[in-house]
Design a protein with these regions (language model features):
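Long C-terminal interaction/binding lobes of large macromolecular proteins
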Residues: 86
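Intrinsic, low-complexity polybasic segments
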Residues: 63-67, 71-74
Length: 318
């Protein structure tokens, strides 16, 4: 039997899926983050191996992935992958792609390997091979587009501390800034001050500078902004609108570069921030429609890992 492996890796978690060659899903698994620019190459490689092992274990199959032997799988039949497709944040840099692709071919044996960005597999899951744009806002943010000729463009996604506007990290960082400004009297009162202190278990907001917060820790604060906005906190409402404007700018930038501002074209919203906040989705749409009134707005309905499986199946059939 032919087996396909699809992996979707980001700054928060990694989802993997095993299917037959006909597309029947056999197992899914979730492990830790695999963005090499945020967690490093070694941690990324470790979690990718763990993802492959775990999905095989759940499918009660033994594979050729190191660390998973037939004996460790209850005597299950030993299988190899026909094709493996991995979509990761951060791999569109040539030096990153080259190193990880070389590792992937050695570590997870298969007849075919494909390494691409998480944005690519998400767009594939949303609209297949059709032209369009996807805006992703999770731990980080990026816009990715594909035109009629298959040409690929991107905007944003340059990472912490230089970019990722409108992301969970950006919202969490600005929540901390707003709380510090509130404490000083440089900015208005905001519920975020108390919420951030409670979330970080600190007696007052000045203690935040002593915390060794990772980008993931900061991104985990973004739901506080959404909660404060629901309670009509003026600062939180402004932060949500600013996030919407920043994310719309990513999409508009690609639509302009592709000459699509007046064309009916799908613009897909994806990632944890979009899933969590109707307010931010509406803000993005409002700002986007000022420049691209005919854009066809879609919320990603299929998990990006399904886009990875689609690519894996195409590789197997090529």
């Amino acid at each position: 039997m032919t087996y396909l492996l699809g992996i979707d890796g980001g700054g928060t978690r990694t989802t993997t899926c095993l299917s037959t060659g006909t597309g029947k899903i056999l197992a899914r698994a979730v492990v830790g983050p695999t963005n090499p620019l945020k967690v490093g190459f070694e941690a990324t490689e470790r979690e990718l191996l763990r993802a492959a092992r775990e999905v095989l274990r759940r499918a009660r199959l033994a594979g050729v992935v190191p660390g998973l032997s037939p004996a460790g799988s209850g005597g299950a039949p030993k299988v190899t992958f026909e094709s493996v497709c991995v979509g990761l944040a951060g791999v569109d840099r040539p030096q990153v792609h080259g190193r990880l692709f070389h590792w992937l071919r050695r570590a997870i044996p298969a007849r075919h390997h494909w390494l691409t960005s998480d944005a690519d597999i998400a767009l594939r899951a949303a609209i297949g091979h059709s032209p369009g744009v996807i805006v992703i806002s999770g731990t980080g943010s990026i816009a990715y587009g594909r035109d009629d000729r298959g040409r690929v463009l991107r905007a944003g996604g340059w990472g912490v501390p230089f970019d990722d506007c409108g992301s969970g990290y950006d919202l969490g960082r600005k929540a901390i800034i707003a709380a510090l400004r509130d404490y000083d009297g440089r900015g208005p009162y905001t519920q975020l001050t108390q919420k951030v202190c409670r979330a970080l278990k600190i007696p007052d907001i000045t203690q935040v500078v002593l915390k060794r917060l990772t980008p993931k820790d900061v991104a985990a604060l973004f739901p506080l902004v959404l909660d404060a906005a629901r309670r009509r906190d003026a600062v939180a409402l402004a932060l949500c609108d600013e996030a919407g404007r920043n994310l719309a700018e990513l999409a508009v930038t690609l639509l302009r570069r592709m000459g699509w501002l007046r064309r009916v074209i799908p613009v897909v919203y994806a990632g944890g921030v979009f899933r969590a906040s109707l307010r931010i989705r509406r803000s993005v749409t409002r700002h986007l429609r000022r420049y691209a009134p005919q854009a066809r707005i879609l919320l990603l309905r299929h998990p990006p890992v399904e886009g990875a499986l689609t690519l894996a199946r195409e590789l197997a059939e090529s």
